[in-house]
Amino acid sequence: MQINELVTFAADVGRGLLESGAETSRVEDTVERIIRHFYDGKSEVLVVMTGLFVTVGDVTKTVRVRRRTINPVSYTHLFL
C-alpha cells in the first residue's frame, strides 16, 4: 500500500468512526493501529471532535467532521 493510499484509508476510517459517535481516544487508537500495521516509520494522529489530522512520513491529511450521530442504545443507562 502506498503512503497516500494509507493516509486516505486511515483518515476515512477515522471519519466514519467520528461520524458514528466514537470517542476521540478510540478513533485515535484505531487509526494509529491501522497505520502501524502497514507502515514502520514516523506517523502522527490527532483527533478532535470536529476532525482529525493524519501524518505518515511526509504526507498529511486533514479531515473535517461536520456530522456526528450518537447511538441512543449506549446512553439508555443515563435515563433509567
What is each of the regions a protein language model found here?
Residues 1-9:
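N-terminal, Lys/Arg- and Ser/Thr-rich interaction peptides
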Residues 23-47:
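Divalent-cation
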Residues 2, 19, 23, 73-74:
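Catalytic cores of large soluble enzymes that bind and process phosphate-bearing ligands
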Residues 37, 41, 62-75:
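Alpha-helical transmembrane segments and immediately membrane-proximal extracytoplasmic
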Residues 76-80:
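Conserved small/polar residues in nucleotide/adenosyl-binding loops
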Residues 9, 14-22:
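Short Lys/Arg-enriched alpha/beta "domain-start" segment
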Residues 56-61:
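Short acidic-glycine loop/turn motifs at beta-strand connectors
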